């Protein structure tokens, strides 16, 4: 907690240094002997550019020796000159925490972008963004499913409450839309608190997200933190920690279950690579930083459940050139409890969410956790889809007529299952003209069990397109057949 007295003491203890070198976002600063600031401390320096004064925050990254430190600037360094006075704040970068952050947009430094009255307010509690993960004895050992109401997720890749979920996919397959949908569903169904960290987010996307959430009435339960694409790499590297710190307060102090959305974790890795290069470190595989695994671990280990409360994290992961062996997505895989792969070939069929049911995984899809019936139905669905995939080469060469009657039935059911795994989203209503749908898990299991049993073999494939539950299927069937 930061109080007014602590602020005053910190100002009195502030140490002055001077800038000795500026190379882009890297600033070297000299301090008096014995008064070097600690690693990760925030420093401030006044910059005048075109008669406009601004304060630039620097974060200590390295001690170089000879009373020199190397820092990363959290803002453009235009106008910064050698000899400029630098002040050590004696604390790391901090962000506001508590109910005051809900419904507002912040940058990585904790400055509110939509209500400046919240800035520099001594009555608002602030936490430093560099924190230790919970100790082992604080961790929650119980495993619980997080029901989303999205059929393909709940049935085939169930999410863990308090777990880490990765949304993998190339550009334009629907990662951000799925994240927006999850924010909406959590706010509507659970009245839960969400924190959105936009790492290297496009300004247009951030604006759209803010306006859509405001329109749908879920903004008041969400805090948004953005490190935009045009900002220095230091900002993009720290914004995920800023959002996580806000989420930790809701978990640890208010005892809430929180959802943390990070879009996009690849840009967190990318920013770390840029910072590593600026600091002069030797690059590792494919040009990434040698500290990639360590930096990812520092972030991911803080995202966890403690006794009675949780942070559930949904992380969009851009896959460069759809290459899953790239070190960035490969390093992320190791920390995840569930992976949802969004597939371009499924999106091209007009099926959304474009989740690939054969490559998406969840560690809790086992009978002891989800139950025997759920597990059995999910395996039957996967089996039918896998068999259909194996038959595609035969169909492409010889045609459907060369298949056995049993295989023809399997292919027909697989097509219905594929289409029924699609679902209209609440956030897509204005684009599709169709209302969004929330399908309870029990209804999802019932529906797919009946499809696998052949109860709907006489229904045309079109009756299953982008719908909610079986009631929607039956209504579509009546509309198509006129019965």
Curated annotation (Swiss-Prot):
Assigned keywords, A-Z: ATP synthesis, ATP-binding, Cell membrane, CF(1), Hydrogen ion transport, Ion transport, Membrane, Nucleotide-binding, Translocase, Transport
Main localization, broad class: membrane
Domain of life: Bacteria
EC number: 7.1.2.2
Cysteine pairs bridged by disulfides in the record: none
Reaction(s) the record says it catalyses: ATP + H2O + 4 H(+)(in) = ADP + phosphate + 5 H(+)(out)
Coiled-coil intervals, chain numbering: none
HAMAP family per UniProt: ATP_synth_beta_bact
Protein name as catalogued: ATP synthase subunit beta
Record organism: Corynebacterium glutamicum (strain ATCC 13032 / DSM 20300 / JCM 1318 / BCRC 11384 / CCUG 27702 / LMG 3730 / NBRC 12168 / NCIMB 10025 / NRRL B-2784 / 534)
């Amino acid at each position: 907690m930061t109080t007014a007295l602590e602020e005053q003491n910190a100002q009195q203890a502030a140490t002055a240094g001077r800038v000795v070198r500026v190379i882009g976002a890297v600033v070297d600063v000299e301090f008096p002997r014995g008064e070097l600031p600690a690693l990760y401390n925030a420093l401030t320096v006044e910059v005048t550019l075109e008669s406009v004064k601004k304060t630039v925050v620097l974060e200590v990254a390295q001690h170089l020796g000879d009373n020199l430190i190397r820092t990363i600037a959290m803002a453009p360094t235009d106008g910064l000159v050698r000899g400029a006075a630098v002040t050590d704040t004696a604390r790391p970068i901090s962000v506001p925490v508590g109910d005051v952050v809900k419904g507002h947009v912040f940058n990585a430094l904790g400055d509110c972008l939509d209500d400046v009255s919240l800035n520099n307010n001594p009555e608002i509690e602030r936490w430093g963004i560099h924190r230790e993960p919970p100790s082992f004895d604080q961790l929650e050992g119980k495993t619980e499913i997080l029901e989303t109401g999205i059929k393909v997720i709940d049935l085939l890749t169930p999410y863990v409450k308090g777990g880490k979920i990765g949304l993998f996919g190339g550009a334009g397959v629907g990662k951000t839309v799925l994240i927006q949908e999850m924010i909406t569903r959590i706010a509507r169904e659970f009245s839960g608190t969400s924190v959105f960290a936009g790492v290297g987010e496009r300004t247009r996307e951030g604006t759209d997200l803010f306006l859509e959430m405001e329109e749908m009435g879920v903004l008041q339960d969400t805090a948004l933190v953005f490190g935009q694409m045009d900002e220095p790499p230091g900002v993009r590297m720290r914004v995920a920690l800023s959002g996580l710190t806000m989420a930790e307060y809701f978990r640890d102090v208010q005892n809430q279950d929180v959802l943390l959305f990070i879009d996009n974790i690849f840009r967190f890795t990318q920013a770390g690579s840029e910072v590593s290069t600026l600091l002069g470190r030797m690059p590792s595989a494919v040009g990434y930083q040698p500290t990639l695994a360590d930096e990812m671990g520092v972030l991911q280990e803080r995202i966890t459940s403690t006794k009675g409360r949780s942070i559930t994290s949904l992380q969009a992961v851009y896959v460069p050139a759809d290459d899953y062996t790239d070190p960035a997505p490969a390093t992320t895989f190791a920390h995840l409890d569930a992976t949802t792969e969004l597939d371009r070939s499924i999106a091209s069929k007009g099926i959304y969410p474009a989740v690939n049911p054969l490559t998406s995984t969840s560690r809790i899809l086992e009978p002891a956790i989800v139950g025997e019936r759920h597990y059995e139905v999910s395996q039957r669905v996967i089996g039918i889809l896998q068999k259909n995939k194996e038959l595609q080469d035969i169909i492409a060469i010889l045609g459907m007529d060369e298949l056995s009657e049993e295989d023809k039935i399997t292919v027909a059911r697989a097509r219905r299952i594929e289409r029924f795994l699609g679902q209209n989203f609440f956030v897509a209503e204005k684009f599709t003209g169709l209302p969004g749908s929330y399908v309870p898990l029990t209804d999802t299991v019932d529906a797919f069990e009946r499809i696998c049993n052949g109860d709907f073999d006489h229904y045309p494939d079109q009756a299953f397109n982008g719908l909610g539950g079986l009631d929607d299927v039956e209504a579509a069937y009546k509309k198509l057949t006129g019965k």
